[in-house]
A protein has these predicted regions:
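Carbohydrate-interacting/catalytic domains
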Residues: 1, 5-152
Length: 152
C-alpha cells in the first residue's frame, strides 16, 4: 500500500493517469488525521485478516451469485473448512446497491434450507440466516461487507 492511500488522495497529474501526490519523486509530509481518511477501516481489515485463517493465503478465492452487476461477491474458506469468510463490495461509489445473493451452503454440506450464523466482522453484529437465498444492501458510506459464516 502506498503512503497516502489511507488518506484517499486521488488528485491526478493534469493530463496523465498518475496521482499528483504520488511519492514516486518525492517524500512529503502528510496529515494522517485529515478528515475523510480510512485509517480505521484499514486497521480493522488487517485485524480481520490476522484473526481469520481463510484470509492467510491468496489461494481459494471463489466468486458467488449476487444478482446485481454493481456488487462483487466472493468468499474464502480455510483449508480445514473451519473458517468461512464472505465479502461483498459495492462497485458504485455514488449509490446504494441491493441484491439477493446465495449463501454457498452446498460448500458446507448443508441443505438449501439450512440455518447458519452470520457475523459482520466490521461491526460485530450477529444474526441467523435461514436458507441459501438472502438479501443485502451496501451504501457508499460502508461500501462493503465482510461476514464470517458458521453452522453452530
Amino acid at each position: 500500500m502506498y503512503s497516502g492511500f489511507e488518506l484517499c488522495e486521488a488528485a491526478p497529474v493534469p493530463g496523465k493517469e498518475e496521482y499528483l501526490d504520488s511519492e514516486k519523486y518525492q517524500i512529503r509530509p502528510r496529515d494522517f488525521t485529515a478528515p475523510g481518511n480510512i485509517i480505521a477501516e484499514i486497521a480493522q481489515l488487517n485485524r480481520i485478516r490476522r484473526q481469520n485463517p481463510a484470509l492467510h493465503t491468496h489461494l481459494g478465492l471463489k466468486l458467488y451469485n449476487a444478482w446485481n452487476d454493481n456488487i462483487l461477491y466472493f468468499g474464502k474458506r480455510s483449508e480445514d473448512g473451519s473458517n468461512f469468510i464472505l465479502v461483498a463490495v459495492n462497485l458504485d461509489p455514488h449509490n446504494a446497491q441491493e441484491a439477493h445473493f446465495e449463501l454457498p451452503l452446498w460448500e458446507m454440506g448443508l441443505a438449501d434450507n439450512a440455518q447458519t450464523q452470520g457475523e459482520d466482522l466490521m461491526n460485530g453484529h450477529r444474526w441467523t440466516w435461514y436458507g441459501k437465498s438472502q438479501w443485502m444492501r451496501l451504501d457508499p458510506q460502508m461500501p462493503f461487507g465482510i461476514w464470517r459464516i458458521t453452522t453452530s
